[in-house]
Amino acid sequence: MAFLWLFSLWLLVPGTQGTKDGDMRLVNGASANEGRVEIFYRGQWGTVCDNLWNILDANVVCRALGYENATQALGRAAFGPGRGPVMLDEVECTGTEPSLANCSSLGWLKSRCGHEKDAGVVCSNETGGVHILDLSGDLPNALGQIFDSQQGCDLFIQVTGQGHGDLTICAHKLILNTNPEAQALWQVVGSSVIMRVDAECMPVVRDFLRYFYSRRIEVTMSSVKCLHKLASAYGATQLQDYCGRLFATLLPQDPTFRTPLELYAYAQATRDSVLEDLCVQFLAWNFEPLTQAEAWLSVPTALLQALLSKSDLAVSSELDLLKAVDQWSMESSASHAEVERLLEQVRFPMVLPQELFELQFNLSLYEGHRELFQRKTMEALEFHTVPFRVLAKYRGLNLTEDTYQPRLYTSSTWSTLVTESSSRSRAAVQVYGYAQYYPYGYDSRRWYYPYQSFQTPQHPSFLFVDKLISWSATYLPTVQSCWNYGFSCTPEELPVLGLTKSSYSEPAIGYENKALMLCGGYSVVDVANFAGSKAPIPSALDTNSSKISSLFPCSSGAFSGFRVVIRPFYLTNSTDLD
């Protein structure tokens, strides 16, 4: 017990937690006060690129490690190249920050540097009389081993899984008493306590209790829901908040869509409106791959109703959406009235006349809902064949209603994909007023940037089916690239997507265009508006930079591409409607 008591006292000493994001160390130096700078982030150590590296940045490192100042700020891997990721680049400190993580930079994992540019420092030998022996990094593992031993306990936890077998785990009140998150357990009077958990959460109970000892836990797609549930039930607020933030990270990682659907059901059961909205948003942006997954047929009716009501639902076309609903209905237990309500959400005016005619032959839903289909088809045909001014005058249609507005249609009719390979093989450069062409790769840092030229109809109405408008979409990572393509940009807003149209469009038609951020080639993790001719590109990961992060982090650290979607609509207040 003396050993346990000493460990518990150690836990109470300030600064005895394990390594955390932003911690720094010096590696490969000839003495303790010099070396390659490494910084900790998300469970691993990485290096810092020497771009903009100077003595102010080095001072931050040295002072954080107990030295008075830095004497040298070195680059070009002066202490040898490191291994692992390059965590930070273009670091700019004032010299007073507690860590490089608090300085201005490109953000975590945004560098394109190689390890030949790893930054290093030499710190002064003066430590102001302070000498630190810090072995606290070993403490979490040692306390975890005490839990694993299941010996010397004074608290016995009976875990019941609601008819699926019980589990008895012993714990140590003295250790639990040092952790405010374990208050629900250490405040128990007596030597035993009962934990009632769902049967599906039994496998993670031991990890949950061990977390109170080591203050470290691995959270996966399969465990996040149960850990969030246990943390909520037992007041482990830090773990609860962490899991809550992690939901957004985990949603894009499951191509089967089982995790988003399970989390949606969990959010409804616990009345967690924030998590519910998060799941609905992710599934709306990724509606197309959802309809192609096996999980599509198990989507709840209420969730499908919520999805179909959204304008920011991404799908190839409204016809493909209707076909997916038709397929879903064949396996669903939804009532006739529930299916009718779903069909009311379909935007029939966004389906072309020929496709509307063919619905009666191609949809299993048609016969059971013939009256609705005929009514919706007639309304859609009026939209396609009658000029806007006549519709507004004689029908009194409110063309601002959702049914007359396009969603995020990702087919080639209404969108284009911009990736690193989506440009022409040659780049044009203006030299003395003449266009000269260079092969792919010419001075790529200055002149070559991904772009796409494409055409779309001016409007979804069949009246405009042959009236095309030309667009150019460009990825703009630098101020120079903005100048090259005729845009005005500030360094703070970069990178951005640029979008221009190069042909005439009807004055009665406006555009609310969108940019979809793609991760891993298939998941949409964020959507940005084109304000004028530019759409901001968020950070792919949640970083310490001032730039906004994507709603759903992209685990690779970079977007795989961008889909530009054109969304025309009638300007109902236009004075020129002919």
UniProtKB/Swiss-Prot annotation:
Residues 260-360 form the BACK domain. It comes from the Eukaryota. Disulfide bonds join 49-113, 62-123, 93-103. One of its GO terms (biological process) is cell adhesion. Its main location: secreted. Glycans are attached at residues 69, 102, 362, 398. Keywords: Cell adhesion, Disulfide bond, Extracellular matrix, Glycoprotein, Secreted, Signal. Residues 1-18 form the signal peptide. It holds the Pfam family SRCR. Residues 24-124 form the SRCR domain. InterPro entries: BACK (IPR011705), BTB-POZ/Galectin-3-binding (IPR051481), BTB/POZ_dom (IPR000210), SKP1/BTB/POZ_sf (IPR011333), SRCR (IPR001190), SRCR-like_dom_sf (IPR036772). One of its GO terms (cellular component) is extracellular space. It is found in: Secreted; Secreted, Extracellular space, Extracellular matrix. Residues 153-221 form the BTB domain. Homodimers and homomultimers. The multimers form ring-like structures with a diameter of 30-40 nm. Binds LGALS1 and LGALS3. Binds ITGB1, COL4A1, COL5A1, COL6A1, FN1 and NID. The unglycosylated form interacts with PDE4DIP; this interaction, which is PDE4DIP isoform-specific, may connect a pericentrosomal complex to the gamma-tubulin ring complex (gamma-TuRC) to promote microtubule assembly and acetylation. Promotes integrin-mediated cell adhesion. May stimulate host defense against viruses and tumor cells. PANTHER family: GALECTIN-3-BINDING PROTEIN (PTHR24410:SF16), HL07962P-RELATED (PTHR24410). This is Galectin-3-binding protein.
